[in-house]
Amino acid sequence: MAELVAKRYAKALFQVAFEMNRYEDVTEELAFVAENLKQHSDLNELLKSPVITLGEKKEILSTIFKEQISPEVFNFLRILLDKSRQGDFQEIYEEYKILADAGKNKIEAVAITALPMDNNDLLKLQVNLSMSSGKNVKLKNEIDPTVIGGVLVKMGDKIIDGTVKARLNQMQDQLLQIIV
């Protein structure tokens, strides 16, 4: 449910920013807000607190951010407060980044392997993914010891499973079809 809400808010903000040709600036401003909320957890708690009134929360927001960010982003933050969605800010920001990257024809991908990939292999995989997807792929490597071998790539809503386990399962299915 929270993911769906985050996508809706992110999409609405992105549409406004895109129409104004400011979606990259808005991305930077949201990153600024996210970093401040991360560094100052007490601020984050104040904005989420049911003890603090909505008016006080808006005043806190105004004092800290009004001169630092555009009116569009500031008003967006106020809307989040009005709708009691300030706790969803980080998820909304993550969804917004995905939309902004798509607007720049970029996509983030993760290569999950049992051991760290060397930079050369990571670069080769990144180039191949970029060529096959037609997008600029930003690839990072994550380690998962449960991966026996090979690589599992998560790119947007696609999963490319090149792991040994997937290949063994595929071979098993083929053998079962022959036997039956």
Curated annotation (Swiss-Prot):
It comes from the Bacteria. SUPFAM superfamilies: N-terminal domain of the delta subunit of the F1F0-ATP synthase. It is a peripheral membrane protein. PROSITE patterns: ATPASE_DELTA. One of its GO terms (molecular function) is proton-transporting ATP synthase activity, rotational mechanism. Keywords: ATP synthesis, Cell membrane, CF(1), Hydrogen ion transport, Ion transport, Membrane, Transport. It is found in: Cell membrane. One of its GO terms (cellular component) is proton-transporting ATP synthase complex. Signal peptide: none annotated. InterPro entries: ATP_synth_OSCP/delta_N_sf, ATPase_OSCP/d_CS, ATPase_OSCP/dsu. PANTHER family: ATP SYNTHASE DELTA CHAIN. HAMAP family: ATP_synth_delta_bact (MF_01416). Belongs to the ATPase delta chain family. F-type ATPases have 2 components, F(1) - the catalytic core - and F(0) - the membrane proton channel. F(1) has five subunits: alpha(3), beta(3), gamma(1), delta(1), epsilon(1). F(0) has three main subunits: a(1), b(2) and c(10-14). The alpha and beta chains form an alternating ring which encloses part of the gamma chain. F(1) is attached to F(0) by a central stalk formed by the gamma and epsilon chains, while a peripheral stalk is formed by the delta and b chains. F(1)F(0) ATP synthase produces ATP from ADP in the presence of a proton or sodium gradient. F-type ATPases consist of two structural domains, F(1) containing the extramembraneous catalytic core and F(0) containing the membrane proton channel, linked together by a central stalk and a peripheral stalk. During catalysis, ATP synthesis in the catalytic domain of F(1) is coupled via a rotary mechanism of the central stalk subunits to proton translocation. This protein is part of the stalk that links CF(0) to CF(1). It either transmits conformational changes from CF(0) to CF(1) or is implicated in proton conduction. This is ATP synthase subunit delta. It comes from Alkaliphilus metalliredigens (strain QYMF). The gene is atpH.
